[in-house]
Amino acid sequence: MIEPDRLISAVSGREREEQLDRAIRPLKLADYIGQPSVREQMELFIHAARGRQEALDHTLIFGPPGLGKTTLANIIAQEMGVSIKSTSGPVLERPGDLAALLTNLEAGDVLFVDEIHRLSPIVEEVLYPAMEDFQLDIMIGEGPAARSIKLDLPPFTLVGATTRAGMLTNPLRDRFGIVQRLEFYNVEDLATIVSRSAGILGLQIETQGAAEIAKRARGTPRIANRLLRRVRDFAEVRGQGDITRVIADKALNLLDVDERGFDHLDRRLLLTMIDKFDGGPVGIDNLAAALSEERHTIEDVLEPYLIQQGYIMRTPRGRVVTRHAYLHFGLNIPKRLGPGVTSDLFTSEDGN
């Protein structure tokens, strides 16, 4: 049996991590590092909306996990000087769930819906008139006596976030006046983020130490901040507390994060494709079965960075590894990958 004080300690530790996460999140666009185009555009749109004393247009933010979609939604509310209410697509199971949120919004408020691509069709139908006309259609009664009434809503801003913009229905996508895509971060911006977070956490970190963490963070701020906290643990226990390049390198090697930012699962994915499927092509379902992982884990968590870095390609016949994957593991490159992938990979069959 677990002792009560251990349970209390575990909760406190989790709360501390959540508090740290909130502390290192920027609250203003001026503090939002990276994504220069998105930052400049949002600054313009927000300034214009505030000048007209209007709610900001509905905004869709999409991109791989961990790039700052939730952070940007909170910044929008902060910059507009309004409140934000947060929920997610899977939570809104019934129209009444959405109606309860909408009717509690004040003028100009932000409603943030994470994983908006997972909204049920029946909830989407309620959302359309709310977004377009700021009206809520509610059915009262049942059977022949049922009737529809319209409730006026205050102007509000819906901010939707998704890792899969392609899964949004056209009617929903078309109702967003602002659409922003977040890209993977470069090492310089990530190093700046790591240094900023270290300062907030009261850590001493050298420029090279921040750069070492940034190099292995897969272009993702969330991962960079997570690695920073683990390197901090290593520095406090096995070092002098300061984070140098050497300390960061030793800590990340202990965490099994290599120089490209690949962890055990990334390497397992690439080696499975090379060893079991001769480098591909392999369908996503076969790959998921071979790895004993969920399909969406591969598509949403692993693949985006590996594709962006040129280690995997999607073809009509399935996924294939590139020559970079063989070079990464010090393996001989197959002849077919000499000048490039042979053209027969790009014909017939669907690789999904």
UniProtKB/Swiss-Prot annotation:
Residues 259-352 are annotated as: Head domain (RuvB-H). Coiled coil: none annotated. It catalyses: ATP + H2O = ADP + phosphate + H(+). One of its GO terms (biological process) is DNA recombination. Mg(2+) binds at T70. Belongs to the RuvB family. NCBIfam families: PRK00080.1, ruvB. Homohexamer. Forms an RuvA(8)-RuvB(12)-Holliday junction (HJ) complex. HJ DNA is sandwiched between 2 RuvA tetramers; dsDNA enters through RuvA and exits via RuvB. An RuvB hexamer assembles on each DNA strand where it exits the tetramer. Each RuvB hexamer is contacted by two RuvA subunits (via domain III) on 2 adjacent RuvB subunits; this complex drives branch migration. In the full resolvosome a probable DNA-RuvA(4)-RuvB(12)-RuvC(2) complex forms which resolves the HJ. This is Holliday junction branch migration complex subunit RuvB.
